[in-house]
């Protein structure tokens, strides 16, 4: 589920950037090719400005809502084990404790005194 949310988040971000770039600016840039200046276009005499503005607002709202949802999921995600590689620190501590128990006791003489 988390990966699906991230994928949707990235797709919405890319589409928002695309919609912002094709909107008609002061110089009628790329937005004019989508019906910004002609009345016989697919969007009608109003042009693409109204449609593109509404779509941008809708996707921006979805982007912010998805940000909150991903933040909420991510904050609760750390409490749940997902797979066998999630808790490697506990496994490392168990191995170190087992090595301390299994290690033979080596009698060491005072190594500070030269022989």
Curated annotation (Swiss-Prot):
Cited Pfam families: SecG (PF03840)
Topology class, membrane: Multi-pass membrane protein
GO biological process: intracellular protein transmembrane transport; protein secretion; protein transport by the Sec complex
Subcellular location: Cell inner membrane
Record key words, sorted: Cell inner membrane, Cell membrane, Membrane, Protein transport, Translocation, Transmembrane, Transmembrane helix, Transport
Molecular function GO terms recorded: protein-transporting ATPase activity
Chief location of this protein within or outside the cell: membrane
Alphabetized InterPro entries for the sequence: SecG (IPR004692)
Transmembrane segments: 2-22, 51-71
Signal peptide: none
Cellular component annotations (GO), alphabetically ordered: plasma membrane
NCBIfam families, A to Z: secG
Known role: Involved in protein export. Participates in an early event of protein translocation.
Similarity-based family: Belongs to the SecG family.
Protein name: Protein-export membrane protein SecG
Originating organism: Pasteurella multocida (strain Pm70)
């Amino acid at each position: 589920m988390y990966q699906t949310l991230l994928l949707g988040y990235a797709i919405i971000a890319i589409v928002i950037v695309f919609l912002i770039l094709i909107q008609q600016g002061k110089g009628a840039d790329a937005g004019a090719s989508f019906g910004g200046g002609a009345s016989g276009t697919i969007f009608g005499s109003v042009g693409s400005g109204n449609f593109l503005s509404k779509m941008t607002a809708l996707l921006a709202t979805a982007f912010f809502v998805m940000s909150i949802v991903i933040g909420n999921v991510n904050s609760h995600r750390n409490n749940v084990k997902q797979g066998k590689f999630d808790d490697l620190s506990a496994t490392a501590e168990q191995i170190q404790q087992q090595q301390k128990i299994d290690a033979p006791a080596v009698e060491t003489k005072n190594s500070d005194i030269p022989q």
